[in-house]
Amino acid sequence: MNHTKYLALLAGCWLVTACENPVDGDLNVDDLDAYTLIYTVNAVEDDSKSTLTFPLERDTVFAVYANLSCIRDPESDVTVEFRTAAELVDAYNEEKQTSYAAMPEACYTIDDTRAVIPAGKYVSSPVMIRLNSAAFDGVGTFLLPMTIERVTPGLPVSPTLGTAYLRINGTYTTNPFRPIDRSGWSVEGFSTEEPEAQTGYDDNGKASSAIDDIPCTYWGTQWRDAKPGPPHWITIDMGKSEELHGFTIRGRADPFTSDTPKASGNPRIFNVDVSDDNASWTRVGTFTVENRIENEVYLDHKATARYFRITVTATQGDMYQTCIADIEAF
C-alpha cells in the first residue's frame, strides 16, 4: 500500500479518536511503528476541547490530555511532558487574525506537566491547570499555548496536533465592583446636544444630564434643526486617575420617568476609549447591547485613566439621534 495514502487514511480515521483496537495482523505495511504518533486532543479545532469560560467568583481547573495513535501498541507506559509556550502567542494571533493576550503566569498553576499514557491505553492522565480567578483583570480571553515538549520513550509528535492553544476567560455572575464616586466628574466635551427642558428638569437634553444623578434626565444629540447621525460621543473628566473595570449605561426612558426604554435611539453599539491627558486615547472596549433601560459592560482588561470617552456608533432602531440618561463607572 502507498505510504502517503495510508498515512492520510490513518490520520483521518484514527488520529483524533485514538487507536482503541490496535491491529496485529498483516496489513502489508513495511514499518508499523512509522504510523505511531503522540498528540493532544486539546489541539483539535473544537471549542469544547480548547476553550473555557468560567465564573470569576471561584477558582477552577482545565484539563489537558496526551493521546496515542498507532497501529501497533508500544506495550509500555508513555510519559508525555508538556510546557507552556508563551512565545507562540504572537504567531497564533497573526495567523488567526486575533489579538489575544498571553495568559499571565499569576493566573494559573500547573503542579505537574507530565501526563502518562498507561500501557494498553490511548489517553493519558490529565495535566491539571489550576486557574487563579483573583489574578484575572477582566473578562477578556487569554491565550495559553500548551505544547508537547518531550515523550518517553521517544515516539514522534504530531506536527499539527502537538500544541493546544487554550483560550480561557472569566465572567462575573454579579458585579463585585463599587461605583466610582462621581462628585468630582465633569463633561469635558461632546459631539452635539439638544436642550429639551421637562417640567422640573430644566437641563434635560444637555450633555451634563448624563452624570447628574437623576435617572430620568438624559443627554440627547441634536434633532431639531441639524440631525447628525452616529458617531456621537461624550467625554468625561473624572477629576483624577481611577481604576476602571466597566460601565453602566442607562438609556432614555419612555414615558420620561419610567423604567421602560425608549424604542429607538438608545445606544446599540459603542466604543470606550480612555486617556490620561484628554489628548492621547486608548481603545479599551467595543460593546453591543440590547435595548434595556440599563446595560452593564465589563472591560476585557482593567484600565487606569482620568478621562473616558463613549462613542455611540449605532443606535437602537438605527435612529440618527442617541440619548444616554446616566453613565456610571466601576
Where do the PLM segments sit?
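Extended extracellular/luminal ectodomain segments enriched in beta-structured repeat modules
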Residues: G229-P231, G239-T248, T304-R306
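Short proline/glycine- and polar residue-rich coil/turn motifs
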Residues: A115-V123, T288-R292
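Acidic/polar, low-complexity intrinsically disordered N-terminal segments immediately downstream
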Residues: E20-I110, P118, Y122-S124, A135-F142, ...
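Disordered, acidic Ser/Thr/Pro-rich linker "stalks" and the adjacent N-terminal cap
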Residues: Y165-D237, R252-S264
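A short beta-strand element within beta-rich, extracytoplasmic domains
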Residues: E242-T260, I310
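Trp- and acidic/polar-enriched beta-sheet ligand-binding modules for extracellular glycan
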Residues: S258-F330
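Short edge beta-strand/loop segments characteristic of extracellular beta-sandwich folds
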Residues: Y65-S69, R130, D237, R250
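C-terminal motif of bacterial Sec signal peptides marking the signal peptidase cleavage site
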Residues: L15-A18
